[in-house]
Swiss-Prot record:
GO terms for biological process: photosynthetic electron transport in photosystem II. [CaMn4O5] cluster binds at E354. This is Photosystem II CP43 reaction center protein. GO terms for molecular function: chlorophyll binding; electron transporter, transferring electrons within the cyclic electron transport pathway of photosynthesis activity; metal ion binding. It is found in: Plastid, Chloroplast thylakoid membrane. InterPro entries: PS_antenna-like, PS_II_antenna-like_sf, PSII_PsbC, PSII_PsbC_sf. It holds the Pfam family PSII. It is a multi-pass membrane protein. Keywords: Chlorophyll, Chloroplast, Chromophore, Manganese, Membrane, Metal-binding, Photosynthesis, Photosystem II, Plastid, Thylakoid, Transmembrane, Transmembrane helix.
């Protein structure tokens, strides 16, 4: 049966038939797999539509003379990071790939939108009777783990798509490429599990930075290979096996429980993305997203070091007002670092600064003889584009927020992902509590008999 026979009684529309009012959203469709499919497909269509429309909006407003991070872009930097339309140094030279990406997403959203409307209005209320493969029962533990397995395989394929792009299809932008960044093929991805999985065991503080501390594209692509393999193998495992008895006892098996698990995973992803957007300058290259806070502070110290060195200052021995080195000093571990208040960020790693290091920190000989013009230009640009706001000359502290002229994409992305992740985590707790209460057999939510909406005039 490809359609709903009774057009005047589409499932999930009334509180009498579902037990939920209209504002309860998809809760009305808990037992209507066909209509829930329509809601999910339509939701995917909305997401893809926003992506396509916003990509075209950013492309139409793009100014070649300005860096992306000065133009409030949040989608084009992602496409540039993938190596589309980029020249050495992160210069955007071709916007056609961005236009094509936007159009492809718009067309895809139309297909998804049609599918969502079809399954919401025309398609069968439930899939179990007509399409048993797509049908399900929330209590069917084996079916639920099969669906989990399918999702894991799709996630693995997504990870492999990035790997294929970096290894075979045009390469990927590497901010660490010599001379200030370039597109290159990742020919030797890191496959050593000791290296890849050691990131999970690193301290989240300082230069270690947990998984956010990754600072080379070989590890990034190697990590995606491991993620892809793990997800595909895990997906096949969950499709072919039944849940063990301990898993059957440990988990709550209901639609709301699965929702809570999903929200918990999304919250973790959102918080991790926020950390990446704020701290990492490898997968979020500063050429596209603007400098990190630490990078802007170091850039300021570096810029004034270059200026004063040209004016004859002895950068090796000059002391600042506190008696510490004005230009260079020692870190807590004995490395030579930039002086002044940048000591807060002494363990920063950035492509424009690393060529001046040796085994014991910054190399005085390199600083005196090897500083390149592109390093000076980049530091001068980053100095005035901190994600915190504009910097003054005191030493890297934001004293006056310059939000009228510049707000860093790092600020937008970090703040949005942090708060979305936080509130999604609250949703995880809420639905987990309701699911556990239902499984335990006691009352949850408000009393349906006295629900305010029952005394209100119907919307139609």
């Amino acid at each position: 049966m490809l359609f709903n026979k009774d057009k005047n009684n589409i499932g999930g529309r009334s509180i009498e038939s579902t037990g939920f009012a209209w504002w309860s959203g998809n809760a009305r469709l808990i037992n209507l797999s066909g209509k829930l499919l329509g809601a999910h497909v339509a939701h995917a269509g909305l997401i893809v539509f926003w992506t396509g429309a916003m990509t075209l909006f950013e492309t139409s407003h793009f100014i070649p003379e300005k860096p992306l991070y000065e133009q409030g872009m949040i989608l084009l930097p992602h496409l540039a990071t993938l190596g589309w339309g980029v020249a050495p140094g992160g210069e955007i030279v071709n916007t056609y790939p961005y236009f094509a990406t936007g159009v492809i997403h718009l067309v895809s959203s139309a297909v998804l939108g049609f599918g969502g409307i079809y399954h919401s209005i025309v398609g069968p209320d439930v899939l179990e009777d007509s399409f048993s493969f797509f049908g399900y029962d929330w209590r069917d533990k084996n079916k639920m783990t099969t669906i989990l397995g399918i999702h894991l395989i799709l996630l693995g394929i997504g990870a492999f798509l990035l790997v294929i792009k970096a290894l075979f299809i045009g390469g990927i932008y590497d901010t660490w490429a010599p001379g200030g960044g370039d597109i290159r093929f990742i020919t030797n991805p890191t496959l050593n599990p000791a290296i890849i999985f050691s990131y999970l065991l690193k301290s989240p503080f300082g230069g270690e930075g947990w998984i956010v501390g990754v600072n080379n594209m070989e590890d990034v692509i190697g990590g995606h290979i491991w993620i892809g393999v793990t997800c595909v193998i895990g997906g096949i495992w969950h499709i072919l096996t039944r849940p063990f008895s301990w898993a059957r006892r440990a988990f709550v098996w209901s639609g709301e429980a699965y929702l809570s698990y999903s929200l918990g995973a999304l919250a973790l992803m959102g918080q991790t993305a926020a950390e990446y957007a704020w701290y990492n300058n490898t997968v979020y290259p500063s050429e596209f997203y603007g400098p990190t806070a630490a990078e802007a502070s170091q850039a300021q110290a570096f810029t004034f070091l270059v200026r004063d060195q040209r004016l004859g200052a002895n950068i090796a021995s000059t002391q600042g007002p506190t008696g510490l080195g004005k230009y260079l000093m020692r870190s807590p571990t004995g490395e030579v670092i930039l002086g002044g208040e940048t000591m807060r960020f002494w363990d920063l790693r950035a492509p424009w600064l690393e060529p001046l290091r040796s085994s014991n920190g910054l190399d005085l000989n390199k600083i005196k003889n090897d500083i390149q013009p592109w390093q000076e230009r980049r530091a001068a640009e980053y100095m005035t584009h901190a994600p915190l706001g504009s910097l003054n000359s005191v030493g890297g502290v934001a004293t006056e927020i310059n939000s009228v002229n510049y707000v860093s994409p790092r600020s937008w992305l970090t703040t949005s992902h942090f708060f979305l992740g936080f509130f999604i985590f609250i949703g995880h707790l809420w639905h987990a509590g309701r699911a556990r209460a239902a499984a335990a057999g006691f009352e949850k939510g408000i009393n349906r008999e006295n629900e305010p909406v029952l005394s209100m005039r119907p919307l139609d």
